[in-house]
Structures are given as C-alpha cells and as structure tokens.
Swiss-Prot record:
Belongs to the peptidase S1 family. Kallikrein subfamily. Keywords: Disulfide bond, Glycoprotein, Hydrolase, Protease, Serine protease. InterPro entries: Peptidase_S1_PA, Peptidase_S1_PA_chymotrypsin, Peptidase_S1A, Trypsin_dom, TRYPSIN_HIS, TRYPSIN_SER. The active site is at H41, D96, S191. Glycans are attached at N78, N169. Residues 1-236 form the Peptidase S1 domain. This is Glandular kallikrein, prostatic. It comes from the Eukaryota. It is an enzyme of class 3 (hydrolase). One of its GO terms (molecular function) is serine-type endopeptidase activity.
Length: 239
C-alpha cells in the first residue's frame, strides 16, 4: 500500500494473509469460516493462510494458521498470463479471483470474522479503503514490505480513467479505484486483498501500473458483486 498508514489493529478481522511456504504473497478475505477469497493470480501449489494477523513479525495470540485443502480459481481467468512475458496491448486480466478452502473452519473470534458478500453495486465517487501488507515503496524493483497491515483511502473512479491509463483491457468486471493526483495506491503484495466501501466488500486488488501510485494511473480491482453467484455456488458445491 502506497501513501497509507497502519490500520487500526481491530478494524480488519476478515483480512487474510496468503502465504507461499513462509513468504507472504497476497491478501485475502474470509467470506465463510472455511473459505478465503483472493486473486486468481495468487495461485501456487502450496498456499497457506493466516487469519487474525496485524503485525506479521510479532507473535500474536489472535492468529490462526491454516493449510489450503483446495484452490478454485475462476474458470475464465486466463492462467497463461502468469507465465513470464512482455505485456501486450489488450491483454485481459478479467475474472481475477479464487476461492481457497481451509483445511478446517476458522474459529470466529473478535479478531477473526466473516465478511459478507456485497448485495448492491458501489457508486463512482465513493471513497473506499484498500488493505494489505504489500510494498510501501512504489518501485517494484525495490519493494519495501511493512510489518503492520496498511490502509489507504481510494476513490471509485469512472472506468474511463483506467482505460485511458492502461494498455491492457479494462472490463465491466473490474472496478477502477485510486487517487488521480497520485501517491495513494495498492502495490506488489497487496493482490487479492479487499477494497472495502462503506463497510462492504466491493473489490479485490488485481492489477495496475508499475511503479505504483503514479498520477492519472489508477489500479483495477475485481468487481466482487459480478461473481457473487459463482462464489456462493463454488462454496456450496465443495462442502
């Protein structure tokens, strides 16, 4: 998170940390005691999930640690985009979401809570907050990762603001959010984490420019409400 600040410790009980072995790779959101929603591009063969975390380098008695028993990326996400390649015009990062089934249900506590799925669309002009343990330095070649979860206020912008800024496709299944003045953004390591608007989960951090936080180059977030039925059906079909 660029241009943000440490989140209040007890303000994010649904925030998940998605690990590859011992390295945090992405954020996520607890949407059911046994399911975490994250970005499809966070997929790997050994995801683990930590809940109830705030400072990743402190021993926190609120923490709960899980293995992932099943990873279900959205079937329409183009996995070939994950191979190293030069970005081409009109690449399409749509459907960038994935459900992770925990090896056992989370214990619901003050520090670990389920976030409901959205029931109505967010309006352009709404100020939302993005959360993550991603880089606080905008230069992707030299990321600087914070100990504590960071929060930043970002505005929901017209899709045209993103369309004008990026060569990859901007579609109706994405939210465009940021600060046109620059200096506030999500960044590498924030992927899959939540964009919360008026207390409602509306987006998952998906993709953006490099470096992060450039003026007139807002980032893209998977529009969760577009996938509500898929999320509910996937959880129901894999009890």
């Amino acid at each position: 998170v660029i241009g943000g600040q440490e989140c209040a410790r007890d303000s994010h009980p649904w925030q998940a940390a998605v690990y590859y072995y011992s390295d945090i790779k992405c954020g996520g959101v607890l949407v059911d005691p046994q399911w975490v929603l994250t970005a499809a591009h966070c997929i790997n063969d050994s995801n683990q999930v930590k809940l109830g975390r705030h400072n990743l380098f402190e021993d926190e008695d609120t923490a709960q640690h899980f293995l992932v028993s099943q990873s279900v990326p959205h079937p329409d996400f183009n996995m070939s985009l994950l191979e190293p390649h030069n970005v081409l015009p009109n690449e399409d990062y749509s459907h960038d979401l994935m459900l992770l089934r925990l090896n056992q249900p989370a214990q619901i506590t003050d520090s670990v809570q389920v976030m409901p799925l959205p029931t109505q669309e967010v309006q352009v002009g709404t100020t939302c907050r993005a959360l993550g343990w991603g880089s606080i330095d905008p230069d992707p070649a030299h990321p600087v990762f914070p100990d504590e979860l960071q929060c930043v206020g970002l505005e929901i912008l017209p899709s045209k603001n993103c369309d004008d800024a990026h060569i990859a496709n901007v579609t109706g299944t994405m939210l465009c959010a940021g600060d046109l003045a620059g200096g506030k953004d999500t960044c590498v390591g924030d992927s899959g984490g939540p964009l919360i608007c008026d207390g409602v989960l509306q987006g998952l951090t998906s993709w953006g420019d490099s470096p992060c936080g450039v003026a007139h180059s807002p980032s893209l977030y998977t529009k969760v409400i577009e996938y509500r039925e898929w999320i509910e059906r996937t959880m129901a079909d894999n009890p």
